[in-house]
Amino acid sequence: MNKAILLLTACGGLIHTMDATAQKQKPNIVIIYTDDMGIGDLSCYNSGWVATPNIDKLASQGLKFNHYYTSSPVSSPSRVGLTTGMFPTEWGINTFLHERKGNADCEQCDYLDSNAPTMAKSLKAAGYATAHIGKWHMGGGRDVDDAPQIPKYGFDEYVTTYEGPDPDPIITASNWIWSEKDSIQRWDRTAYFVDKTLDYLARHKDKPCFVNLWPDDMHDPWIPSSGFYPISESWASRNNFVAVLTQYDKQIGRLMEGLEQLGIRENTLVIFTSDNGALPTFDNARTNGHRGSKNSIYEGGVNMPFIVSWPGTIKAGETDNESVINAVDLYPSLCQIAGAKLIEGFDYSGEDMSQALLGIKEQRRTKDMMWDFGRNKYFNKPQKKQRSPHLGIRRGDWKLLVDSDGKNIELYDIKIDPNETTDLSAKHPELCSELSKKVIDWYFTKRKVRTK
């Protein structure tokens, strides 16, 4: 039976496979990428203000990371980073993809170039069956009708929402995240995506599979099932959030039960994470007290929950407090584990962190971690102390934030000040000069510029 990797749920040259992995059959890979989930949304990470027993069980069966970072504090670029192994601004996407005018106002492309390297292309070349199930948001939808179809990125089958080309009509009756006319109602969409994932795995048990399972929970509007709905509260209410999170957690549990029933749970590596931080944060409860939120490069916007479980391979019940990993590292790392090769000819931002993912040893990135979050009229949230400069760089425990004009420099020691309360820029002018020059030069020389 095939080994399986489930990624819940964003380096030049070829990657050599690990000797131990090379002796095994190729694993399945399923990526589950939760939408807008903060690190404080899971009870295995927080003080228990919400309960997520099924995801907690997943954590207890595997390895939990405290220093995993998304490649962007908002949807589209975070997905580009995970998919390509490159920082998303290098593909001309620095915020959520909008209609054409909105993308032009943001000076970004309308969609991810289909010539980009992708995890699916590499794994398909290595003999994998490939599927994308759930939110896409890397091009297509709204008034962008010329975006490449999802198979151009390496997927054999797909089911997607209105934020992508060729959306599934039974969940997309209108150009909006949810419509009362949908055949599959908003509160049943994660269950629908789980069903599709399990069906795909069942139909392809004769070969290794790579499946993106990208639900659109926990993105608002939060609309619970008929047991809660209709209610008079706002879609953004705390009660609605807790109800939807409870239902989402149950679907993760049902997914894991489905893997057991298919006989592949013991052969499944599970990585659970989120595309970006939470908004609203409910007074930073959803960020575990971290400053910032979705749309911010402070920790609340980019430090995500990250859980890895692979029974019999990864020791259960451990926490990694030292490894520092970015979403761009997943492409090279999973290729390493799966015996696949990175597509040649690209300057990858990601590094092979497979030994950390497998719990063999702690690893820290040797390359600087970079962020660029576009700033324009669309970004009216967050404000005040939660609103960060739009460029960021992390080197070791140092994290510097700055605007591309060189103004608004902030410097934090994340190891001793994870909530970014004490700006140390005045005490370390030489370090600030070095880091700000590095990230500003990167921004102006590496970003892909919209051409139309």
Regions inferred by a protein language model and the residue ranges of each:
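Bacterial Sec-dependent N-terminal signal peptides
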Residues: 1-25
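A short aromatic-rich beta-strand->coil structural motif
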Residues: 29, 35, 123, 135, ...
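Active-site segment of extracytoplasmic enzymes that catalyze sulfate/phosphate-ester chemistry
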Residues: 31, 39-118, 122-128, 142, ...
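A short beta-strand-to-alpha-helix junction
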Residues: 47-52, 69-74, 106-117, 184-193, ...
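Histidine-centered active-site microenvironments of extracellular/periplasmic hydrolases
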Residues: 143-154, 221-224, 234, 257-313, ...
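C-terminal cap/loop subdomain of S1 sulfatases and analogous C-terminal strand-loop tails that border
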Residues: 278-297, 314-323, 328-414, 445-446
